[in-house]
Structure formats: structure tokens, C-alpha cells
Amino acid sequence: IKEKFTKALVTKVEKLKVGNGLDDVNVGPLIREDAIDKIDKQLKNATDKGAKVLTGGERLTGSDYDKGNFYKPTVLDNVTREMDIFYEETFGPVIPLIVFENEDEAIEMANDSEFGLASYFYTKDLARVEKVGAALEYGMVGANEIAISNPETPFGGVKHSGFGRENGHYGMEEYIQVKFINLKYRD
């Protein structure tokens, strides 16, 4: 299914509108200049080791983009564990395509990270949602959904992506100091 998926993905990514986040766009600017440098470094490392940029892969320039840190949405094929992008957080519009043979391998690859904020997967099988969701070592898991954060639900990660939670009643517990008083009462 990889070829069919990749072709459809590249077509969709090439239609994304990039621009000022306050305008009607799909992709806004990166937070800082060094975020662009990080993406460039990751892409160079990956392509030097055999990955292929299918679309994007460069900073956007020109009158609409000179006042911000805009990067062309990118699809990177043939990504392997030998590449920095497999392990490092990118925080930019890059989709690395990583092939796996079965569900167990996909879970193992996803968990092979020092980070654990959020993970996402798609399925039509409710039993798979329960199994994969429980097996993923992440603080938040989106099944068939990417918008998984809202004020009513706990937000936070595991591993090097944090400890504790924000939002929801679990988030409120982070601000509560529990005090225990032990009293031995005698008449």
C-alpha cells in the first residue's frame, strides 16, 4: 500500500497553502530561524544516508515569505533508523515515511525514542485502538485524530517529553499540595 499512499500524500502536501498563520493557510511559519536550520540538517543527514525528498525540502523565499521562517511542506521517503530524523523531534512541516512489516514492528519502532509526548495512528478496528493505544509509550495517543489536546483532557508526555499533566482534573492536581496530619487523640 506504500506506493498508493505515498502518491496520494504527496499530492495533498503539494496543495497545502503556506503563509502567515493569521491568514487562511494550512501551514504557518516556524517558531525561529534555527528551526529551519534544524530541518535542513536533518534532511541533509537523511538524504546522505539514502532518503529521498519527494516534495518540498527547502525554505520558502520571496515577498510573501521574507518576513518569517517558512518551510515548504516536505515528504521524505526511505527513512531508516540510521537517520537523525528517525530519533529527533523536527517541529516543522516534514513527513518522514518509514516502512514497517507488521503492527508489532510499528509499535516497537514508535517506542524506540527518548521522547513520548504524543503519537498517532489510524485504524478501523476498535480492538486495535485498545491494543496499540496501550502499547504506545506516549502521554497522549490520537487514534484516527490529530487534534488530541483540549482544556478538558490531560496534556503531557513521558520519557524526555515531560512529567505530570496540564489541563483537566489531572492538571489541577499538579497545583495541589496534599498535607497529612496524624493525630493521636486522648481524653
Region locations from a protein language model:
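Conserved C-terminal structural/oligomerization subdomain of aldehyde/semialdehyde dehydrogenase
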Residues: 14-17, 66-187
